[in-house]
From Swiss-Prot:
The keyword Transferase applies. It catalyses: phosphoenolpyruvate + UDP-N-acetyl-alpha-D-glucosamine = UDP-N-acetyl-3-O-(1-carboxyvinyl)-alpha-D-glucosamine + phosphate. Belongs to the EPSP synthase family. MurA subfamily. It is found in: Cytoplasm. Signal peptide: none annotated. The modification 2-(S-cysteinyl)pyruvic acid O-phosphothioketal is found at C119. InterPro entries: Enolpyruvate_Tfrase_dom, Enolpyruvate_Tfrase_sf, MurA_subfamily, RNA3'P_cycl/enolpyr_Trfase_a/b, UDP_GlcNAc_COvinyl_MurA. This is UDP-N-acetylglucosamine 1-carboxyvinyltransferase 1. The gene is murA1. The active site is at C119 (proton donor).
Length: 438
């Protein structure tokens, strides 16, 4: 069993490099299925388990993929005859796999995709995806754990999303690129990853306007082709390291981080007394000796991102006073708090809100990650804990962070990823930090 072991108490200093965005590259990989000619070259691709999973989905669909993990590039040839069925063994591992449905339906007129899996944080139904595809003219059936969509020719439509779902916005937008006529989507997701997908689609020959606003307009085209595209930087990874720097009273330059993409987080951190400055090379974060309490409510973009909620709770628990966090996006995203209670966190959950009483004198403990962002939050808690913290169930961490422990070690954390037998308490030796940074 692999686990991350942290010896808390070290101040983080230095520079940290941010990868391409997981939440951008996955739908862009799916969108490559729309290219009936030419090849696609993607750069700044993060080396994550979710990327390997999506690559396997595309390979099963008969695309040719070459992933250069050293240079972080992917070359894709989707011009061949494609299969229209995405099987359970791949899709069940990752929720984002459902976004292959729109591209397959648009290009082949048929898509059969297993119901998605991924992190267990709320029900996250795909009804909005199917409602939008149905509006474009697809016939939808659900059976035997699969969703099957069929359409001789998709046609443009006026679509209003009941909720600005990121996945539904992506799926419908991709399907509409090859539809006959004009599609107008209202109340859509506005995340930077939506803008990155739209930019990629336009480079492929699509006609998409309005991405990043509440209304997206897509004029259907006859065919699309491969292109070159660089994945946008990961705002959630950037935010995670910003919180880690702040909570350890550190001084860290988060390289290539885009301040515009993290405005809600930056605003709240400044409210808590954290110094956050934009520099030509990225965002610098300097943590204060005393953090002020604050209230946070997660919202769809441009509100505070739900993917930063678990990490933010660590910052709030370290604040001197009472903080409040309300989760409005997912109904079950406080599972990491039970693990933090084992580390001496004091809080009270009331419905979709949690009241946190700080400052917390975190104790090291063995804790288990329950989802991707919870895993990162537990590691950050370990950075400010007395003694040793062991974080297990790292499969979640690997879905969204590349070399997380190594990057923290280079910033000065005493942290290491180890393979130990079940039940073993790992003891750090004096050379721990040096070994971890290698």
């Amino acid at each position: 069993m692999e686990e991350i072991v942290v010896h808390g108490g070290q101040r983080l200093t230095g520079n940290v490099h941010i990868e391409g965005a997981k939440n951008a590259v996955l739908p862009i990989l799916a969108a490559s299925l729309l290219a009936s000619s030419g090849q696609t070259h993607l750069s700044n691709v993060p080396v994550l388990s979710d990327v390997f999973t999506m690559n396997n989905v595309l390979k099963f669909l008969n695309t040719k993929i070459d992933f250069d993990e050293i240079n972080k590039t992917i070359d894709i040839d989707a011009s061949r005859q494609l299969s229209s069925e995405a099987p359970f063994q791949y899709v069940s591992k990752m929720r984002a796999s459902i976004v292959v449905m729109g591209p397959l339906l648009a290009r082949l007129g048929h898509a059969k995709v297993a119901m998605p899996g991924g992190c267990a944080i709320g029900s996250r139904p795909i009804d909005l995806h199917l409602k939008g595809l149905n509006a474009l003219g697809a016939e939808i059936e659900r059976h035997d754990g699969y969703v099957e969509a069929t359409a001789n020719q998709l046609h443009g439509a006026a679509i209003y999303l009941d909720f600005p779902s990121v996945g539904a916005t992506q799926n419908i937008m991709m399907a509409a690129t090859l539809a006959d006529g004009i599609t107008t989507m209202e109340n859509v997701a506005r995340e930077p990853e939506i803008v990155d997908l739209a930019n990629y689609l336009n480079q492929m020959g699509a006609k998409v306007t309005g991405a990043g606003t509440e209304t997206i307009r897509i004029e259907g085209v006859k065919a699309m082709h491969g292109c070159d595209h660089s994945i946008v930087q990961d705002r959630i990874e950037a935010g995670t390291f910003m919180v880690a720097a702040a909570v350890t009273q550190g001084n860290v330059l988060v390289e290539d981080a885009i301040a515009e993409h993290n405005k809600p987080l930056i605003s709240k951190m400044r409210e808590m007394g954290v110094t956050v400055t934009e520099e030509p090379a990225g965002i610098r974060v300097i943590g204060p000796e005393i953090l002020k309490p604050t209230s946070v409510k997660t919202m769809p973009h441009p509100g505070f991102p739900t993917d930063m909620q678990p990490q933010m709770t660590i910052l709030q628990l370290c604040a001197q006073g009472t903080s409040l966090l309300t989760e409005t996006v997912f109904e079950n995203r406080f599972m990491h708090l039970d693990e933090l209670r084992r580390m001496n966190a004091d809080f009270k959950v009331e419905g979709r809100s949690v009241i946190m009483y700080g400052p917390t004198d975190f104790n090291g403990a063995q804790v288990t990650a329950t989802d991707l962002r919870a895993a990162a939050a537990l590691v950050i808690a370990g950075l400010v804990s007395r003694g040793y913290t062991e974080v297990t169930n790292l499969k979640y961490l690997d879905r969204g962070y590349f070399n997380f422990h190594g990057k923290l070690a280079k910033l000065g954390a005493e942290i290491k990823r180890v393979d130990v037998p079940d039940g073993t308490v790992y003891a750090l030796n004096p050379d721990f930090a040096n070994e971890a940074a290698e």
